[in-house]
Amino acid sequence: MKMETLKQQILTAKGDVRAELVLKNARVINVFTNEIEQADVAICQGIILGVGHYTGETELDLQGKYVCPGLVDGHIHIESSMLCGPAFEQAVLPHGTTAVVTDPHEISNVAGTAGLDFMLETTKDLALSVYFMLPSCVPATGLDESGAVLEAEQLRPYYQQPRVLGLAELMNSYGTVRADEKIMQKIRDCTAAGKKIDGHAPFLSGEELNAYVTAGVQSDHECSDIHEAMEKLRRGQYIMVREGTAAQNMDSLLPLFREPYCSRCMLVTDDKHPGDLLQGGHIDYIIRKAIAAGVDPVVAVRMGTLVPCQYFGLAHSGAVAPGYTADLIVLSDLEQFTVEQVYKNGKLVAQQGKMLHPAALAVDKARFARVFDSFNMDEITPEQLQLKQTGTRQRVICLTPHSLLTTEKIVPFCQHPGTAPGVDVAQKIVKLAVFERHHRSGHVGLGFLGNYGLQCGAVASSIAHDSHNLIVAGTNDADMVLAGNTVRKNKGGLAFALNGQVVGELPLPVAGLMSTESAEAVEEKLQALKAALKAHGISEDIDAFMTLAFVSLPVIPRLRLNTYGIVDVDAQQIVPAVF
């Protein structure tokens, strides 16, 4: 900073020079002292220079409205919104989110460093600050078949990027606590760069948790009960309280929303569908929900602002105080957390739920050919769905409402007219398949899914964490083939087939994960699909696509299905579907 600039800032803060912008007569949410101050907020050149009594070149009388720091999502996968950067910004910035920390491991699993470069390129000029954690597990484990493999040497150069804050969720906790050499190399590089390492270790406890933290893992977003969260807090980790589309853990973790725990806890969404962002909100939604549950509003705000900024080392961000970046939101109502205005670097960027100057997606498709042409598989045939009956019992992967966890259920092998062998609609058991789509290997994993609720037809999705192969669930093979081939034809997306007809589809041509359309356009097609599926039995407490997308992730207990077959996550072994 030039000496003259600093001098002007000091004189403005002192009140000797008029500020560029003053938000007058505000109620300022102070996240340092947990109080609300009656004051003006003085802003110059994107920086807050004072909280007190000020005059400005431009003055805005807030008439007692609240001024709050801009909200920060400490852990999200933008790709899970199905939106590219500009459309994602339009969905979250009007809700008061001024910064996100994203882990682009979805697109990196499909397209490797080309996917990472795509995300960096398409978010660099947004008003929304988009920071990155480098994908640590591409693929998630050795028992997965991704489109790319990212080792330490591929990640190392990215630590020089100013928007890269560290190494993203170490999902392979099994390998981490056993000092796997490749994981150790990634940890070493991140530590040498002075950056953060995020965790992902559901139910890790005792000595293994000690080993995980010793490795340098400083946070966790997978806690689903208070006892797990407390143990991790005691071992020095920060807790990311997750409230997303599929995984909703806030209610179980409400005891953390008070001292002394709240200073080590932050709010995150992890994965959010576009409709939830547009209608319910983003971090503002979690704060509203917490306040409704009896949480002190200022504590909830602190967990969505200052705490993530302190954790990630985002200096001079996350508070309304002198010297802090003027990323601010104006609230008309604190209890309802109603966002009226959003300021980014002191400039008004959103008002009454709309961005003032939305950005458009501008990208060289030729440069990112691997991103826009990500399907490398042959047409699906009925023969690929043939499951050999090698026994009298079948293993069912059972979904858990409002959770990513699954359970195991063993039932007698069944055959009913009009459905594929093993399908029992009355018992909510459907057939499940995962087709490899990156290397034309022809690998197919087959199994059974419980509690999904589908009564007829088939659902297909190229969003299938984390390797994002093609996952299909259905009651009969013919519709499964049709739904899967529809997604293949569209180079990615979602589809629902019924009685030999495609009832609905949502193309996602960007790595098979994202659309180039607006959030509203994507949501309209998504809701039409969800409505059709709901009419055909999908369980009320299951998100038809978000929940299905996690069924193939072999790092969350208990059972998963990928291109190799059914994975016992705890044992990290393939187990038979029929035995």
Regions found by a protein language model. Name each.
Residues 1-39, 43-44, 52, 93-95, ...:
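Active-site microenvironment of metallo-dependent hydrolases
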Residues 2-12, 89-194, 260, 503-507:
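Divalent-metal coordination cores built from histidine and acidic residues
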Residues 26, 46, 64, 75, ...:
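Divalent metal-coordination and catalytic microenvironments
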Residues 73-84, 139-150, 218:
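Active-site mouth loops of central-metabolism enzymes
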Residues 77-79, 105-107, 135-140, 170-173, ...:
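Active-site beta-loop-alpha junctions enriched in small/polar residues
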Residues 111-115, 141-147, 178-182, 208-212, ...:
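Short acidic, glycine/serine/threonine-rich loops at helix termini
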Residues 149-169, 175-240, 247-268, 278-292, ...:
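Histidine/acidic residue-rich metal-binding segments in metalloenzymes
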